[in-house]
Amino acid sequence: TERGSLSIRGIVISNHGARQIDTVKSAVQLLYECTRALKKVGWLGRDDPEFSVFVDGGVRRGTDILKCIALGARAVGMGRPFMTAMAAFGEEGIARLADILHQEIIVSMRLMGCRRLDEVKEDVLDTRALDLPLPGYIRSRY
């Protein structure tokens, strides 16, 4: 199906961080599968401003954000870390968390040899484990 005929501008991949039900795939695993499928049918290109993938669920660190970007996400949502920072330290906690995440992203990008976010691509990740089904995932009767 042609994307334009459906007026689809993007998708949101969201779950509960895969904490609630065992054998459920994490948001990162689903992101990996979805972006591979979207690329295969020509709906997702790295520089395509007309289609975006957003993801959230289980994102806790700057490295998690970079992994999602490398796998094709245009934006990454975080809930729990910001709620915890707000509850514990108020506005200062939010600002401090944002600074920590920023520093984690900058340091990780330097270690990967990337100067800009558009240089963070899937080939900087070891995705072999994402190709494997979770134990019991396919055979589970629950």
Question: What does each model-identified segment do?
Answer:
Residues A18-V24, R61, T84:
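Short, small-residue-enriched loops and turns at beta-alpha junctions
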Residues E2-L6, L71:
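Structural motif
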Residues Q29-D56, R60-Y142:
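Alpha/beta catalytic cores of nucleotide-metabolism and tRNA/nucleoside-modifying enzymes
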